[in-house]
A protein has these predicted regions:
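Formylglycine-dependent sulfatase
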Residues: 2, 11-416, 424-443, 447-462
Length: 462
C-alpha cells in the first residue's frame, strides 16, 4: 500500500501535534517549603509560583531516595536506584561506577520516540566518558559531572583554602571537557549560565521537525551557594539570594517558550532531587512542617515540591494530595509522548490520568529506601517506619562560621506508625493503637522488599 505525499505530511503533523515538548527542571537540595506557592515567606519565587497557578501542584510528591545520584537515577530510569546498584550514593570524582549503559534513560527513550534531547546542569550519574550524557541518549549537553561542593575550595564564599581531596570541578559540553568552575566568580555565575544555555537549547530546537526534551538540573541551591550580583546580599538569607537567582532562570526558560510560540505545546515540570541539607543553617532550605531533611526517610528528606503545567491538558490552579514520585516521570512522559516501554522492568507508574483530571494517581503506596535498606512504607494516611538508624538534624552542634555544616547526630527509630493526615511531623507514634495497620504495612514492606531483591541489575563499571 502506498500513501500520497500529502497524506504522509498530514500524518506526520498529527503525530507531532500529539507529542508535546517537555521541559523537566530539577533543583538540588530544595525543600518542600522553599517556594512561595508552598508557603515560603522568605524566598522570592514569582516565576515558579506563577507556574503553579497555571498548572498542577502536588503536596505528596516524593524523591525516591534523599541523596543526589540515587534520586537522579530514579528520575532518569523509573527504577528504584538500589535496583541498579546506585542506592544511597553521591558519586564523586573519578568514580569507577555509574549508571549502566544497559539501562535506558528518559533521554534515550524519548530520542527513540523522535525527540531532540538535551541536558543542562548537574548530571551525577558517573563522570567517566561511558557514563556521560552522550552515552545515555542526549543529543546536546552542558553539564557538571557531580555536585558543586566537590571542588578544591570550601563551602564559604571567598574561602580560598584548597582541599586536596578534590580536583578542579570540570565542565563538559557534549561529552568533551571545556574548562572548570575555577573560583567563586564562576560559582556565582553558575545558575545564570545554566539558564542561558537552556534558553539557547529552546531557541535552537523549537519549531523544527522534532519535538524536544530538555532536562535542566540546576546545581543550586546545593552548597556552596552562589548567586549573581543582581541578588547577592539582597534578601534575608544567602539561600534566599540563590532561590531568587534560580527563579529568574526558570522565568527565562518560560519566556523562551513564549518567545518561540511553543508554550501551549510544552509540558513543564519543576521539582527537587531531595529535601534540604538542614545542617547548613541560613545556607539551607526548609522542609516546613515535615521532620528531618536530606539523607533521611522522614518526610522532610523525601517529600519535595512538584509542579506540572501542560496547557490544554492540566487544568490551571489545581492542587492534589495524590501519591506520586520521581520514578513515575518515565512511564508518565512515555505515555504522554508516544514512547515505548523500556526493555527492562521499571518501578514507576504512569500518573497521566491524574494530569488529565482524575483524582487518583494510580499509586496506592510508596516505599522509602535509603541505600539498599527499606526503612519505611506509606499507604494512604499511614506511614510505618521499620527500625533503622538515621542522621538527625535536631539539636545539632553549631558550626564555627555561617555557611559551614553543623554537626548532626546519629539516632535510632524503632517500629513506629504515624498518621500523616493528623501528624505531618511524624511525632506521635500510634502503632500500639493500630496493630492491624502495622501488620498490614509490615506485610506490604516484606512484599516490596522481595520484589526488588528478585529484580536487581548490575551497576555500570569501568
Amino acid at each position: 500500500m502506498r500513501f500520497s505525499p500529502t497524506l504522509c505530511l498530514l500524518l506526520s503533523a498529527c503525530l507531532f501535534a500529539a507529542q508535546p515538548n517537555v521541559v523537566l527542571i530539577m533543583s538540588d537540595d530544595m525543600g518542600w517549603a522553599d517556594l512561595g506557592c508552598y508557603g515560603s515567606k522568605v524566598n522570592p519565587t514569582p516565576n515558579i509560583d506563577r507556574l503553579s497557578s497555571e498548572g498542577l501542584r502536588f503536596t505528596s510528591f516524593y524523591a525516591t531516595q534523599a541523596v543526589c545520584t540515587a534520586s537522579r537515577t530514579a528520575l532518569m530510569t523509573g527504577c528504584y536506584p538500589n535496583r541498579l546498584g546506585l542506592g544511597g550514593i553521591a558519586l564523586g570524582p573519578g568514580s569507577k561506577i555509574g549508571l549502566s549503559n544497559d539501562e535506558q534513560t528518559l533521554g534515550t527513550l524519548l530520542r527513540h520516540a523522535g525527540y531532540h534531547t538535551g541536558v543542562i546542569g548537574k548530571w551525577h550519574l558517573g563522570d567517566a566518558p561511558k557514563f556521560l550524557p552522550p552515552a545515555h541518549g542526549f543529543d546536546d549537553s552542558m553539564i557538571l559531572p557531580y555536585s558543586n561542593d566537590m571542588w578544591p575550595l570550601g563551602y564559604v564564599m571567598g574561602d580560598e583554602t584548597r582541599r586536596k581531596m578534590y580536583p578542579e570541578l570540570p565542565r563538559y559540553v557534549n561529552g568533551h571537557q571545556i574548562g572548570y568552575v575555577k573560583d567563586w566568580i564562576d560559582m556565582d555565575a553558575l545558575t545564570s549560565a545554566q539558564g542561558l544555555r537552556a534558553m539557547k537549547f529552546i531557541h535552537d530546537s523549537a519549531g523544527k521537525d522534532k519535538p524536544f526534551f530538555l532536562y535542566l538540573a540546576t546545581s543550586m541551591p546545593h552548597v556552596p551557594l552562589g548567586a549573581s550580583s543582581d541578588f547577592k546580599g539582597k534578601h534575608a538569607t544567602p539561600f534566599a539570594d540563590t532561590m531568587a537567582d534560580i527563579d529568574r532562570a526558570v522565568g527565562a526558560v518560560l519566556k523562551a517558550l513564549r518567545d518561540k510560540d511553543v508554550e501551549k505545546d510544552t509540558v513543564v515540570i519543576f521539582t527537587s532531587d531531595n529535601g534540604p541539607w538542614l545542617n547548613f543553617g541560613r545556607h539551607a532550605g526548609s522542609a516546613g512542617p515535615f521532620r528531618e531533611g536530606k539523607g533521611t526517610t522522614f518526610e522532610g528528606g523525601v517529600r519535595v515540591p512538584c509542579i506540572i503545567k501542560w496547557p490544554g491538558v492540566v487544568k490551571p490552579g489545581r492542587t492534589t494530595d495524590a501519591l506520586a514520585a520521581n520514578i513515575d516521570f518515565v512511564p508518565t512522559l512515555l505515555e504522554a509522548c508516544g514512547g515505548t516501554k523500556p526493555k527492562n522492568a521499571i518501578d514507576g507508574r504512569s500518573f497521566l490520568p491524574l494530569l488529565k483530571g482524575d483524582k487518583d494517581s494510580g499509586r496506592e503506596a510508596f516505599t522509602y529506601f535509603y541505600g539498599d535498606k527499606l526503612e519505611a512504607v506509606r499507604q494512604g494516611r499511614w506511614k510505618l517506619h521499620l527500625p533503622h538508624a538515621y542522621r538527625s538534624y535536631v539539636d545539632m552542634i553549631p558550626a564555627k562560621q555561617d555557611g559551614l555544616p553543623a554537626t548532626t547526630h546519629q539516632r535510632q527509630i524503632g517500629l513506629s506508625l504515624f498518621d500523616l493526615d493528623a501528624d505531618q511531623g511524624e511525632t506521635n507514634d500510634v502503632a500500639a493503637a493500630h496493630p492491624e495497620v502495622v501488620k498490614e504495612l509490615q506485610e506490604l514492606a516484606a512484599s516490596e522488599r522481595k520484589k526488588l531483591d528478585a529484580g536487581k541489575r548490575p551497576v555500570g563499571r569501568l
